[in-house]
Curated annotation (Swiss-Prot):
It comes from Porcine hemagglutinating encephalomyelitis virus (strain 67N). The lineage of its organism: Viruses, Riboviria, Orthornavirae, Pisuviricota, Pisoniviricetes. This is Non-structural protein of 12.7 kDa. Belongs to the coronaviruses ns12.7 protein family. It holds the Pfam family Corona_NS12-7. It comes from the Viruses. InterPro entries: Corona_NS2 (IPR006841).
Length: 109
């Protein structure tokens, strides 16, 4: 099987479902405004058994000067058989990671 991953040119973006919660967390911890993309998973893809929809999000850091970005911190991808479930799963994972990261960074510095 060929390796498949979601490409930016095929993604559609949403701010529905629970994306507003992710926006609030990104704003609170000073990350770039989130863009959650989604697409259908093709039948030939190796990850089709995970679900027919894929939601993806890349977390970017932002400096305190608001004009410079630190770059990519990490990426998230979630699969499910419904679009709503895939986006909700993605938002849950991303919010959980962002809050964990903020707590871990506060411990060391």
């Amino acid at each position: 099987m060929d390796i498949w991953c979601p490409e930016k040119k095929y993604l559609r973006y949403t701010n529905g479902f629970n994306v507003s919660e992710l926006e609030d967390v990104c704003f609170k911890y000073n990350y770039q405004f989130p863009k959650v993309g989604y697409c259908r998973v093709p039948n030939y893809a190796w990850c089709r058994n995970q679900g027919s929809f894929c939601a993806t999000f890349t977390l970017y850091g932002k400096s305190k000067h608001y004009d410079k970005y630190f770059g990519i911190i990490t990426g998230f991808t979630a699969f499910s058989n419904s679009l709503e479930e895939a986006v909700n799963k993605l938002v849950f994972l991303a919010v959980d990671f962002i809050t964990w990261r903020s707590q871990s960074l506060n411990v060391y510095g």
